[in-house]
Amino acid sequence: MRKIIVTVAPVCHVGKEIPEECKNPLTPEEITEDVVNCYKAGACQVHLHTRDLKGNPTFELDVFQKTINMIREKTDM
């Protein structure tokens, strides 16, 4: 049997504007919930971007670290 790797990218990184039809989690809690659901469905890797509460991309370490910690508490990703 051939093995595959399933990667999930829960946060759309298309600039400042998020398309209306796109479900895009913003908070670490929302991102974690999506990642955990994908993990349960077979995903084994996450490609992560974070956003602030206004929907803008953010590279703030505390937001990223909180999100990573929450994901690691609930998965082995």
Where are the predicted features?
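Alpha-helix N-cap and loop-to-helix initiation/capping positions
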Residues: 22-30, 55-66
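Histidine-centered catalytic micro-motifs
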Residues: 8, 45-54
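A structural motif
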Residues: 40-43
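Alpha-helix-loop-beta-strand connector modules within alpha/beta enzyme cores
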Residues: 2, 57-77
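Glycine-rich loops and low-complexity Gly/Arg-rich segments
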Residues: 30-34, 70-73
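Conserved, mostly hydrophobic/aromatic
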Residues: 31, 38, 49
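Glycine-rich, aromatic-flanked loop segments that form ligand/cofactor-binding clefts
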Residues: 1-11
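Active-site mouth loops of central-metabolism enzymes
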Residues: 9-33
